């Protein structure tokens, strides 16, 4: 699955070695001569970084080497990924950053999920006949753009835990955007596949110079993005949420049919949340609460599967995949019916994880038979309250988004697990002219047809699947897991945990083990490596796995060995990611 190329990167040395008046800068050592020479697995005594792009990993690792903590490194990495993976995340989007504070032992989530503008309406994704506008159309319109939260989230994280300033941490990414870097295979493929979307906006001048898509090995220069980063460096987040940039951003959204105003940007705020917790085979799991559906349904699936002693079956047996698929169908049915922004709707968290409800769902799973009509259950029987919404059938035409996940741990015990996104590849494709910021299409994560828990409302956050997760043993963090991939995120995190803990696989093997995803009887995916005879058996039972495998997710993970004092980082081979361990010289 690993995509490689052999373009010399030594010219980047001048980009990443930052000089100037600021006393501390994140820097990167002279990179190897090709991206594929970076390690997907590394070990460190003093910290670890694992991201989906080697240059972002270098920048984060350099923060740790120079005395910054995991939160400082995470902020620097997010800016770097905005440059190196512009199709996946950035300051035009949002995300969920989970932080374990090594000093206080508290685990906290910075929720920078985008919000709908004040002008958003429940029916804004319906046509004049009251029918849902096709996903392919609504995904590129201004109505799809949510008020971005990433920058506010980074600011809050630094205020709470940081030891370096945003001014310092953004500088290497300014240099990277100004001077450029060689495009890798993942970005090149994205530009080629989405050139029609990019050609409609200011993005064409960046990614399609002279009308032709940039290719692998070409240098990507983003001078307008560098200019925006410089504004943020000098004026802070107000440079984004107020003033000339805010006006240009909101005007651009309106030009593409949206309603966002400067006031929407000025009024945006993040939330600081506690994780939702669960137990699994002696581990305590901290994961994301609503408005992400990721955590609650990760825990629900783990609880359902724990009953079946999954590892009695071979890891690539039809029995294992049958139990996974049936469990996914039930949990994703619940997700579609009961999950939404808790500031607006009642989410039955206790009911969904209640032991009696879990038993009820387990009884619907038969090893030898496919449940042809998996439906949502009634978790409200197991807790007080009731739904303030209906169950509304939605169109089946949504394309799962991308995103990026990265993770950092430092020598002081701080741990970050961070999933961040602009939703689809290149979001809406809309770029803020003269500023180089690509805008998300996050509002298409709302239901197109109103009435359900996830209908569009002003200031509401659309339902997410992002699942940054930290596992604890004896109250100490021992494993971070997360992935991109839209609704597939939950299944990728689930399977990584199952393979590492239930099956006892070494971490890299657990990350690389072929994954499946199915949220209903009409939607199936599987990765290369699932045996053909197993697929035939499953399809003979009534499943509908297709003929072509696809990559599912892109897991980055860190395991922490407290006894030996080591960190092990793993980057998934489905992108050109890198794990970099920190080993400081001892005097």
From Swiss-Prot:
EC number from the UniProt entry: 3.4.19.13, 2.3.2.2
Subcellular location, in the record's words? Secreted
Q: In terms of one coarse class, where is the protein primarily found?
A: secreted
Keywords of this entry: Acyltransferase, Glutathione biosynthesis, Hydrolase, Protease, Secreted, Signal, Transferase, Zymogen
- Propeptide residues? 29-35
Q: Which InterPro entries match?
A: GGT_bact, GGT_CS, GGT_lsub_C, GGT_peptidase, GGT_ssub, Ntn_hydrolases_N
Any one annotated GO CC term: extracellular region
Reaction(s) catalysed by this chain's protein? an N-terminal (5-L-glutamyl)-[peptide] + an alpha-amino acid = 5-L-glutamyl amino acid + an N-terminal L-alpha-aminoacyl-[peptide]; glutathione + H2O = L-cysteinylglycine + L-glutamate; an S-substituted glutathione + H2O = an S-substituted L-cysteinylglycine + L-glutamate
> PROSITE patterns in the record, alphabetically?
G_GLU_TRANSPEPTIDASE
In this record, what's one Pfam family?
Answer: G_glu_transpept
> Which pathway does it take part in?
Sulfur metabolism; glutathione metabolism
Where do the annotations place L-glutamate binding?
A: 113, 421, 423, 442, 445, 464-465, 485-486
Tell me the first and last residues of the signal peptide. 1-28
Mutant phenotype after disruption: Loss of ability to grow with glutathione as a sulfur source.
Among PANTHER family, the record links this protein to: GLUTATHIONE HYDROLASE, GLUTATHIONE HYDROLASE PROENZYME
The entry's function note states: Cleaves the gamma-glutamyl bond of extracellular glutathione (gamma-Glu-Cys-Gly), glutathione conjugates, and other gamma-glutamyl compounds. The metabolism of glutathione releases free glutamate and the dipeptide cysteinyl-glycine, which is hydrolyzed to cysteine and glycine by dipeptidases.
| Protein family according to the UniProt entry | Belongs to the gamma-glutamyltransferase family.
Q: Which NCBIfam families match?
A: g_glut_trans
Subunit and partners: This enzyme consists of two polypeptide chains, which are synthesized in precursor form from a single polypeptide.
User: What name does this protein carry?
Assistant: Glutathione hydrolase proenzyme
